[in-house]
């Protein structure tokens, strides 16, 4: 079932006449793991911002369950439908990892962090004292326990070693296939792309289905 879609999306910056994204159309289904790839400057970050309701298209519609999100509240779309895993992690820096995770699900436990490889002694430490890779684990754990049906992730394995990155990819796939979430990952990682159900490529502002994953 389609949960998120792009319909004839065009996007340009206010001070430019050139479209960064040109007539994008895509449908994303619940229970699937998507990878979005492309060279630097291809528009991947803008693409993700539009899906998240952080920005609005110049022309076209972004729809959740068939409804144009512009007809409602962008903030409600982000709060109720989306959980973000961005490169700046979006963590509350004065809280601990466990407190951050419980912001989206009060029933979350330390086990949600332990299974992502965060050491137990770090769970009650201020997140500012964690490394980039450790903060990345917290952000992913928060997304996984969220009740939001869609996870949007920007390079979620970027600060992780190869072994941990592989585990994270498996967990994201599980979130899609077993929990029914729609997981969309912007990535440069061949590992993530290969593991995905579907690979979409952004090139010169155009979106095309590059290939299926596993």
Locate each region found by the language model:
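Conserved ABC nucleotide-binding domain
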Residues: 112, 116-128
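Conserved ABC ATPase signature
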Residues: 126-130, 134-136
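ABC ATPase NBD coupling module
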Residues: 69-83
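Catalytic Walker B motif of ABC-type/P-loop ATPase nucleotide-binding domains
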Residues: 151-154
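Helix-to-loop junction immediately C-terminal to a conserved catalytic motif
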Residues: 52
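Hydrophobic anchor residue at the start of the ABC signature
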Residues: 140
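Conserved ABC transporter NBD signature motif
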Residues: 60-68
